[in-house]
Amino acid sequence: MSVVNRRIAVYPGTFDPITNGHIDLVSRAAPLFESVVVGVAQSPSKGPSLPLQQRVTLAREALCQHENVQVIGFDTLLAHFVRHVGAGVLLRGLRAVSDFEYEFQMASMNRHLIPEVETLFLTPAEQHSFISSSLVREIARLGGDVSGFAPAAVVAALRQNL
């Protein structure tokens, strides 16, 4: 078993792109922990629309007001990344009941792989509960206005890349 720090949380995701819902979750988690590491996953199987480094940059820009938040890209197994940063908490967002089954399965697998790490679920603020990266991408791809769902830099990146 690795030494973990329960004051360090990892919030993993593809963040393709980072949305106002993600930002809200990090903003509410930041005061609860000494450090929040936003782990931006390479996730080649998901076929991200934005390259990893651009997703990391956009997340850093969106979260720069939080001194205890760092954004790191990774291309390893999540369990290895969590151990690498020494985190004792894995943060996940639950928007709706539809998220629960998948998140419960992932939490169970992570408990098997990294039993020393606890998974903590946070629900979004109501105004962000319907936002997902895939919906934001689809709306942007079809020429819709996503400025209410993501930071301006993300909106510009989507216009350029989709």
From Swiss-Prot:
UniProt keyword list: ATP-binding, Coenzyme A biosynthesis, Cytoplasm, Magnesium, Nucleotide-binding, Nucleotidyltransferase, Transferase
EC number: 2.7.7.3
Catalytic activity: (R)-4'-phosphopantetheine + ATP + H(+) = 3'-dephospho-CoA + diphosphate
GO molecular-function terms, A-Z: ATP binding; pantetheine-phosphate adenylyltransferase activity
GO cellular component terms, semicolon-separated: cytoplasm
Highest taxon in the source lineage: Bacteria
Transmembrane segments: none
Pathway assigned to this chain's UniProt record: Cofactor biosynthesis; coenzyme A biosynthesis; CoA from (R)-pantothenate: step 4/5
Cofactor(s) listed: Mg(2+)
Cellular location(s): Cytoplasm
Residues binding substrate, per UniProt: 14, 46, 78, 92
Site (Transition state stabilizer) residue list: 22
Pfam family for this entry, one: CTP_transf_like
Binding annotation for ATP: 14-15, 22, 93-95, 103, 128-134
Keyword Nucleotidyltransferase attached: yes
Gene3D superfamilies given in the database record: HUPs
Gene Ontology biological-process annotations: coenzyme A biosynthetic process
InterPro entries given in the database record: Cyt_trans-like, PPAT, Rossmann-like_a/b/a_fold
Job of this protein: Reversibly transfers an adenylyl group from ATP to 4'-phosphopantetheine, yielding dephospho-CoA (dPCoA) and pyrophosphate.
The protein's assembly and partners: Homohexamer.
Family listed: Belongs to the bacterial CoaD family.
Protein name in the entry: Phosphopantetheine adenylyltransferase
Gene name per UniProt: coaD
